[in-house]
Curated annotation (Swiss-Prot):
Keywords: Activator, Chromosome, Nucleus, Telomere, Transcription, Transcription regulation, tRNA processing. Its main location: nucleus. This is EKC/KEOPS complex subunit cgi121. The keyword Transcription regulation applies. Transmembrane segments: none annotated. Belongs to the CGI121/TPRKB family. Signal peptide: none annotated. Component of the EKC/KEOPS complex that is required for the formation of a threonylcarbamoyl group on adenosine at position 37 (t(6)A37) in tRNAs that read codons beginning with adenine. The complex is probably involved in the transfer of the threonylcarbamoyl moiety of threonylcarbamoyl-AMP (TC-AMP) to the N6 group of A37. Cgi121 acts as an allosteric effector that regulates the t(6)A activity of the complex. The EKC/KEOPS complex also promotes both telomere uncapping and telomere elongation. The complex is required for efficient recruitment of transcriptional coactivators. GO terms for biological process: tRNA threonylcarbamoyladenosine modification. InterPro entries: CGI121/TPRKB, CGI121/TPRKB_sf. Component of the EKC/KEOPS complex composed of at least of SPAP27G11.07c/BUD32, cgi121, gon7, pgp2 and SPAC4H3.13/PCC1; the whole complex dimerizes. It is found in: Nucleus; Chromosome, Telomere.
Length: 174
C-alpha cells in the first residue's frame, strides 16, 4: 500500500490469529535478526485500522523531520501507538510478547509486493492470516488492555477512536 502523504514509501500490514511461535519470534527480535525487521504488535491493543495507519504516519513524519526517538522505523511505529513518551513503556504496552496469541505485523519500506511479503512472513509466523480490517481487529481486541493503555473512561468507550487518535497525534506535546 502507498500512503498519500508518503508516495515513495511502500507499507504492508498483516494480521495473524492463533500464532503459536510468538516466543520464538520474540527471541529473534531481541537478537535483532534482520529477517524480522517488522513492527510486531499485539493485536489485543489494536481496535482500528486508523489506529495503525495513524501510528505509521506519525513514525514516517518523525523520520522525515529527523525526530525519531528510536533506532528503526518499525520501533518508531510501536512508540507512535503509545500516548506516553517512554520507549520501554510503549514496547510493554503495544509490542508483541512471548505470550501474544494474535498479532499485527507492519512492514515499511518493503521492496516486495504485498503477496511476496506475505509469503516471506508466512515462513516466520505460525498462525492464520486474517484480513486487516476493523471487523477482524475488533474480534481480537482486549478492551481491558485498551482502556488501560489509552486511559479511556466510560464516556469515551462508546466511541474510543477519537481519543485513541488524539493520543497518537499529541504524544509528547502535552
Amino acid at each position: 500500500m502507498i500512503l498519500p502523504l508518503f508516495p515513495e514509501t511502500q507499507v504492508h500490514v498483516f494480521v495473524y490469529e492463533n500464532v503459536s511461535n510468538c516466543a520464538a519470534i520474540h527471541e529473534q527480535l531481541i537478537s535483532q535478526n534482520p529477517i524480522y525487521d517488522y513492527a510486531f504488535l499485539d493485536a489485543a491493543t489494536i481496535l482500528y485500522k486508523k489506529q495503525v495507519y495513524s501510528a505509521i504516519i506519525r513514525a514516517l513524519e518523525d523520520r522525515r523531520d529527523e525526530q525519531m526517538k528510536t533506532k528503526t522505523i518499525h520501533s518508531e511505529v510501536i512508540l507512535s501507538l503509545s500516548p506516553k513518551t517512554e520507549i520501554s513503556s510503549a514496547f510493554r504496552q503495544f509490542s508483541m510478547t512471548k505470550k501474544s496469541k494474535n498479532i499485527v505485523v507492519v512492514k515499511i519500506d518493503s521492496k516486495l509486493t504485498e503477496e511476496e511479503e506475505f509469503e516471506r512472513l508466512d515462513k516466520l509466523v505460525e498462525g492464520n492470516r486474517v484480513e486487516f480490517s476493523d471487523e477482524e481487529l475488533q474480534k481480537l481486541i482486549d478492551f481491558k488492555v485498551l482502556k488501560k493503555n489509552y486511559k479511556l473512561d466510560p464516556s469515551t468507550l462508546e466511541n474510543p477512536l477519537a481519543s485513541i487518535l488524539s493520543s497518537i497525534a499529541l504524544r509528547g506535546y502535552s
